[in-house]
Amino acid sequence: MTDFQFYLASNSPRRAQILQQLGFRFALCCCEIDETPLPDEKGADYVLRMAIEKNNAARQQWQQAKFSQNRPHLPFLSADTSVILEDKILGKPKNEADARAMLRALSARTHQVITAVCVADENQMQTVIQTSHVRFKVLTEKEIQGYIATGEPMDKAGAYGIQQLGGVFVEHIEGSFSGVMGLPVCETVALLKAFGVELF
């Protein structure tokens, strides 16, 4: 009997942390994909496509003989999160100037955080999209520069992490806090349950 319940097709330490805190047992199985948005692609369409492509890539990798040898057939969980401001997808900043521009744009405004979750095995695939609305306070240039200097924004969509220092900029959130982090727990647990992976 294996000591894990599913494969996590994600490089995100935040998603792994959320799942570990819930008590799930999983093995990492992820690979890089092209995350470039298509021309005029909507935020919800983009995150759903990314979640599915991550899942497909991980399952394809698993099927390779060297990886799948002595590995059990279990579901694969993948997800993708994007920050959307006025229909524009804000991915991870390319550099500090990009992070500064994103944070200036988010200042004193409400944006969407959309996360798509995908669970699949050899027989079926199920997906869900969760959308939250997040409002930032007015950010000063000193706050923006100080935050960028911590390095925290550089690996996060929209250039902030709500569960860390970036949370001090959030005035209001409507939706899922864990979804803004990168994995909406209510929806994710329901998807996993449909594949026989249960918490209780």
UniProtKB/Swiss-Prot annotation:
Q: Any one cellular component term from GO for this entry?
A: cytoplasm
Name the catalytic site residues: D80 (proton acceptor)
What does the record give as EC number? 3.6.1.9
Major subcellular site: cytoplasm
UniProt keywords (A-Z) are: Cytoplasm, Hydrolase, Nucleotide metabolism
Q: Any S-S bridges, and between which cysteines?
A: none
Instruction: Extract the signal peptide range.
Output: none
Residues with site note (Important for substrate specificity):
R14, T81, Q163
Protein family per UniProt: Belongs to the Maf family. YhdE subfamily.
The protein's job, in short, is: Nucleoside triphosphate pyrophosphatase that hydrolyzes dTTP and UTP. May have a dual role in cell division arrest and in preventing the incorporation of modified nucleotides into cellular nucleic acids.
Protein's UniProt name: dTTP/UTP pyrophosphatase
